[in-house]
């Protein structure tokens, strides 16, 4: 009897050993997967010093024609309304003013934005001159001249906002590679181009510092024609700070003697699709939305432009960039587009 029971006992012991080994293996696998997942999660969240993610909350542009408001946390303080403006200065301000006057922009301390709202100290701009994380977040606009501001009106404007706002202006674009995806509501400031840059269409930008002209980077295009067949060249300016009435809802033509009724819409469509929209092989932009009734024509005095060089300027704003992931590399004067 005992000889017959022995194999059974050995079999049970073996089964227990196998079960224990299986359990240990499963535990080890789970721990490994957990660690791997932690590493993957960490890899997906680059360090703040290298890349700064900013999430958009609201597209405010069509309400105020000023840009895009979003939410960002700086030094632990949440700024609810941050106006993104990648290059447009106020037209009544000399763009070279800062250099001529050795002008120093003054900036609110971002870590005291909340504390100072609603107090008399809000009007004391000079007390909060600081550059935070090298980003130069600015209240209001990148190029406001302090000597032209009625500080009482300015304070009243700030009180009327949902919360204090700061401008991510052209100075930020000059320092960082800026990636923006309007469709998914995010922006990233980085010290380098992303690893996925090979998926983007690279488009060289031109830099112009023409006095009196508010925008400084553009894409030079040819093949643009009027209805009478006359050829035109055009500078396509890229301005995320001007959201209302741009791109396919309208475009801004700054030629003094030219109106949209004179422009061959199919030629304009070809211009945009072939030279800007060539980021992908096939595009389906709503060209039919280019209704003359919704277009805005901005006329600038001829003395401010060299019309022998420039026939027309087209301003592409937020409406256009909704169709793309866009990367601005101002240091190298490059624009990258990928259809989203």
Residue ranges and their predicted role:
Residues 34-340:
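Pepsin/retropepsin-fold aspartyl endopeptidases
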Residues 1-48:
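Bacterial Sec-dependent N-terminal signal peptides
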């Amino acid at each position: 009897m005992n000889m017959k029971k022995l194999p059974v006992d050995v079999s049970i012991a073996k089964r227990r050993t196998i079960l224990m080994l299986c359990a240990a293996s499963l535990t080890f696998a789970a721990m490994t997967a957990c660690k791997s997942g932690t590493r993957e999660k960490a890899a997906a969240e680059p360090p703040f010093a290298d890349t700064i993610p900013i999430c958009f909350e609201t597209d405010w542009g069509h309400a105020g024609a000023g840009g895009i408001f979003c939410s960002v946390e700086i030094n632990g303080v949440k700024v609810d309304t941050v106006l993104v403006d990648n290059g447009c200065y106020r037209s009544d301000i000399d763009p070279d003013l800062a250099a001529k006057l050795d002008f120093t922009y003054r900036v609110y301390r971002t870590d005291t934005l909340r504390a100072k709202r609603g107090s008399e100290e809000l009007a004391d701009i000079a007390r909060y001159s600081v550059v935070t994380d090298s980003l130069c977040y600015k209240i209001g606009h990148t190029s406001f001249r302090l000597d032209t501001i009625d500080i009482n009106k300015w304070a009243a404007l700030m009180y009327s906002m949902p919360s204090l706002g700061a401008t991510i202006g052209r100075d930020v674009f000059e320092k960082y590679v800026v990636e923006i995806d309007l469709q998914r509501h995010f922006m990233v400031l980085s010290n380098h181009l992303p690893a996925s840059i090979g998926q983007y269409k690279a488009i060289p930008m031109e830099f112009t510092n023409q006095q009196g002209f508010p925008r400084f980077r553009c894409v030079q295009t040819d093949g643009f024609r009027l209805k009478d067949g006359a050829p035109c060249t055009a500078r396509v300016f890229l301005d995320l700070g001007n959201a209302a009435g741009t791109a396919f809802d309208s475009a801004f033509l700054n030629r003094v003697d030219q109106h949209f009724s004179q422009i061959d819409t199919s030629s304009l469509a070809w211009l945009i699709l072939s030279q800007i929209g060539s980021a992908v092989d096939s595009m389906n932009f709503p060209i039919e939305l280019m209704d003359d009734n919704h277009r805005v024509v901005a006329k600038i005095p001829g003395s401010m432009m060299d019309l022998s060089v420039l026939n027309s300027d087209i301003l592409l704003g937020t409406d256009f960039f909704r169709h793309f992931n866009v990367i601005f590399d101002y240091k190298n004067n490059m624009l990258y587009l990928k259809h989203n």
